[in-house]
C-alpha cells in the first residue's frame, strides 16, 4: 500500500502518535528514541506493577523502582512526555494471583506471558487508545508484518533474543495495534544505537528475574499469597514406593533433581527427578530421567493466529513446529484440534515439559511465523514403569 509510514500506518510520522511501553531498559529506550528520531509524536508510559517501596533499590528486573527512574530520565533526555501508571492492583489480580494458584496446583507458570496477555497488551493498549495513539510500540524482539488477512507475528532477526514464546497469547486485534521496531535489529545493534544516541541506559544489564520476586525465591511469594500450598506430603517413586517427605509441592518443579528429601533409609540405584506433582494427594512423584520424555501434549486456552478459523483445522492435523520451553528450539510436530483445546504430537521427544508452561506453534514451512499456542495441561510420558515380573505399564502422565 502507498502512503504508509515506517510503522505501516497511514499518515506522516509527525501526525502519528505512538505510545511506547518504557520499562527503563535498553530495548524500550531505544524504541522510544528511534521513533522520536523518525519524527513520530511519541508518548512514554511506564507501569508500576508491584510494591514500589520494596523495589526502589533493586536492579535487574523489569519495572522495578530504579527502572521507573531510568525510564523517566530517558524520556526527559529525548524530549517526550512520560507517565507512570499505577497498575499494582490489576497486576496482583491478573498475574501474581495466577502465579500463586498455578504453583499450588502443581504447575510451573510463566508470569511474563500473563503480564503481556492481561496487563500490557490489554489495559495499557486501552490507555494508548485513550491517548489518541495510532499504535502501541514495545521493545520486544519479535516482528509484526502485514499479511493477506491482517498483521502476522514472526520470529525476529535476532534469534538469540527471540521473545515469540512469551507473546504467543497476543490476539489478532491486539496485533493490529502493536508495533515492534526492534524486530529487524540484533541486540548488539540496539546497544550500538543507544551508544550513538547517548542514552544513559546504554550499558544497563538486561533484566533476568521475575519482577515481583525480590529475593529470587518464588516460594516466598506463593506462601504469602496461598499459605495452604506449603502443606507437607510424601515423595513417591513411580513404582509406588514412598521414599521420603517434603514440605510442600510449591518447592518442586518438573525435572528437578536436587533437594528431593529422599531419606537414606530408602537407597536408590539411579538419579531421580521430579516427574509429576499431585496437589490433591500432596505427592511429589519421582522417577528416572527417561520418565521425563514426552511426545504428546494436551493444551487448553488456544490462541490462534494462523490462517482461517482454528475450528476448521483439518482432521488429520496441521504440520507445525512447536516450542515447549523458552530455552528450547522449536521441534517438528503435528497439531490436532479437540473439543476443549488441542493436542500436539511431537516428532521428537522432549524432556521436562511441565503443565502450566506454554506450547507455541510456528508454521511448518520455515518455522518463522507464529501461529499461536496454548497452555499445557497434560503430558504423556514415553517411558514405562517396570512391574514385578515381565509386564510393563505406562508411566502416569503429568497433569
Curated annotation (Swiss-Prot):
Enzyme class: transferase
Primary localization: cytoplasm
Gene Ontology molecular function: ATP binding; tRNA binding; tRNA-uridine 2-sulfurtransferase activity
Gene Ontology cellular component terms for the protein in this record: cytoplasm
Site positions (Interaction with tRNA): 140, 357
Keywords linked to the UniProt accession: ATP-binding, Cytoplasm, Disulfide bond, Nucleotide-binding, RNA-binding, Transferase, tRNA processing, tRNA-binding
Tagged with keyword Metal-binding: no
Disulphide bridges, residue numbers: 115-211
A Pfam family matched in the record: tRNA_Me_trans_C
Residues covered by region (Interaction with tRNA): 161-163
Coiled-coil features, chain-numbered ranges: none
GO biological process: tRNA wobble position uridine thiolation
Keyword tRNA-binding: yes
Protein name: tRNA-specific 2-thiouridylase MnmA
Organism: Parvibaculum lavamentivorans (strain DS-1 / DSM 13023 / NCIMB 13966)
Taxonomic lineage of the native organism: Bacteria, Pseudomonadati, Pseudomonadota, Alphaproteobacteria, Hyphomicrobiales
